[in-house]
């Protein structure tokens, strides 16, 4: 999936920003979170997050649910490289495995399981 954030900000600027963030906040992960384009789920109010390294994927999903004011009965799926990461995985391990060459971790979310793949822990 194409990232609007990548389209709007040149690579060098993104890379410099991610490096600055990692130097200043070594225990945090720079994350860009965007909605899957064709999803009918609400659009999030901010794309950039500074996530504690010891946060789990499940806890991050909870943060996203709160930001988009998603009701409990509605489903949300998050994807990293078009794969559903394990809920219990730490954001730090997801970051190490999937960070972009610019230093950000790109996460997309949807109201439906758009891609269908699961990552095994």
Curated annotation (Swiss-Prot):
<dbReference type="GO" id="GO:0031410">
    <property type="term" value="C:cytoplasmic vesicle"/>
</dbReference>
<dbReference type="Pfam" id="PF02991">
    <property type="entry name" value="ATG8"/>
</dbReference>
<keyword id="KW-0449">Lipoprotein</keyword>
<keyword id="KW-0472">Membrane</keyword>
<keyword id="KW-0813">Transport</keyword>
<dbReference type="GO" id="GO:0015031">
    <property type="term" value="P:protein transport"/>
</dbReference>
<protein>
    <recommendedName>
        <fullName>Autophagy-related protein 8</fullName>
    </recommendedName>
</protein>
<keyword id="KW-0968">Cytoplasmic vesicle</keyword>
<keyword id="KW-0072">Autophagy</keyword>
<dbReference type="InterPro" id="IPR004241">
    <property type="entry name" value="Atg8-like"/>
</dbReference>
<keyword id="KW-0653">Protein transport</keyword>
<feature type="site" description="Cleavage; by ATG4">
    <location>
        <begin position="116"/>
        <end position="117"/>
    </location>
</feature>
<keyword id="KW-0833">Ubl conjugation pathway</keyword>
<keyword id="KW-0926">Vacuole</keyword>
<dbReference type="InterPro" id="IPR029071">
    <property type="entry name" value="Ubiquitin-like_domsf"/>
</dbReference>
<dbReference type="GO" id="GO:0000421">
    <property type="term" value="C:autophagosome membrane"/>
</dbReference>
<feature type="propeptide" description="Removed in mature form">
    <location>
        <begin position="117"/>
        <end position="121"/>
    </location>
</feature>
<feature type="lipid moiety-binding region" description="Phosphatidylethanolamine amidated glycine">
    <location>
        <position position="116"/>
    </location>
</feature>
<comment type="similarity">
    <text>Belongs to the ATG8 family.</text>
</comment>
<comment type="function">
    <text>Ubiquitin-like modifier involved in autophagosome formation. With ATG4, mediates the delivery of the autophagosomes to the vacuole via the microtubule cytoskeleton. Required for selective autophagic degradation of the nucleus (nucleophagy) as well as for mitophagy which contributes to regulate mitochondrial quantity and quality by eliminating the mitochondria to a basal level to fulfill cellular energy requirements and preventing excess ROS production. Participates also in membrane fusion events that take place in the early secretory pathway.</text>
</comment>
<dbReference type="GO" id="GO:0006914">
    <property type="term" value="P:autophagy"/>
</dbReference>
């Amino acid at each position: 999936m194409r990232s609007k954030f990548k389209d709007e900000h040149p690579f060098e600027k993104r890379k410099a920003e991610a490096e600055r963030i990692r130097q200043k906040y070594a225990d945090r992960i720079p994350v860009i979170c965007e909605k899957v384009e064709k999803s009918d789920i609400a659009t999030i109010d901010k794309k950039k997050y500074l996530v504690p390294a010891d946060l789990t994927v499940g806890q991050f999903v909870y943060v996203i649910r709160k930001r988009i004011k998603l009701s409990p009965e509605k489903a949300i799926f998050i994807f990293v490289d078009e794969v559903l990461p394990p809920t219990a995985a730490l954001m730090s391990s997801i970051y190490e495995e999937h960070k972009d060459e610019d230093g950000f971790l790109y996460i997309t979310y949807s109201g439906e399981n758009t891609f269908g793949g699961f990552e095994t822990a």
